[in-house]
Amino acid sequence: MKPWNVVLGVDVSKKTIDICWAEQKLSLHADNNSEGFGKFKKWCKDHSIDLSKTFIVLEYTGGYEYRFIQFCESQHIDYRRFPGLEIKNSRGMVRGKSDKADAFRISQYGEERVKRLEPSNPLNKDILELKTLLAFRKRLVRERAGYQNTVKERKHMYEVGDQDMIIAMAGAKIAANDEYTGDIEARIMELIKSDEKMYFNYQVITSIKGIGPINGWMTIAYTENFTSFPDARHYAVYVGVIPFDHRSGTSIKGRKRTSYLAQKELKQELNQAARIAILHSPEMRAYAERKLKNKDYKLILNNVKFKLILRMFSLVKRGEKYVENYRRAA
């Protein structure tokens, strides 16, 4: 285990970073760019912080942290990202919120666990491009849906045909978006196939009933090919399908519920995967039918999502494709 003398917590936003050394109650606010990183290096020098013996802890932000991570890798600084929910749940009762306070709490979280921390793997450029392509594909799909709604509403309200100028323009936009989406999907598959391990894992998880290409792409991207989360449960917390207790003493007796702090796009795509699994997987269908007798459908759907995550991580770990061998008891 490498001896780290300093653990820094970093709260990253789109334009700024807040860095804190909780043990010494030192903090820095800087821009999330090269100039800000230079300011960070000077701050470390002024406070005798040896970056070669420094460990940086930060949260997943969906991409805002990548520029800072690239800086860390260029300077050979060890770092690790954690789901925001995991850090939040470790804090206990917290009053108030600011970027500076968040950086302090992240640093505390790292200091408490420093003996068990392992650095993250270096960023994979193919994974970064994959995430960028998926984000742009999502934008194109949403735009397409908007244009489709425009056509539908205009035809309904004004009883016009395809020769109407607005409908014709919207149709052209839809056709262009379809072409661009196809190009992006082709590039996504090209990226995945260019990496033998990535392509094999993609084939493994899409062999599961319910996990189609889009869920496969997103899972590969956001787990960074199953390297950025230690196990299925940590990923499930990140996605937001793990329910947490909501009770205290005799006055608060809430049911377990999932947190609003989640990667909502992944969760949304898994919703569709869970519905398909219930329809087409005999095992999942039997589970849903059994539980529907006394459980709410939303709870069952959430449980199926967790089962799919467990199945993906288990199969990837074993390096095996899914084989349907369920036999319903007579």
Q: Where are the regions that the model predicts?
A:
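Short glycine-rich phosphate-binding loop at a beta-alpha junction
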Residues: 52-64
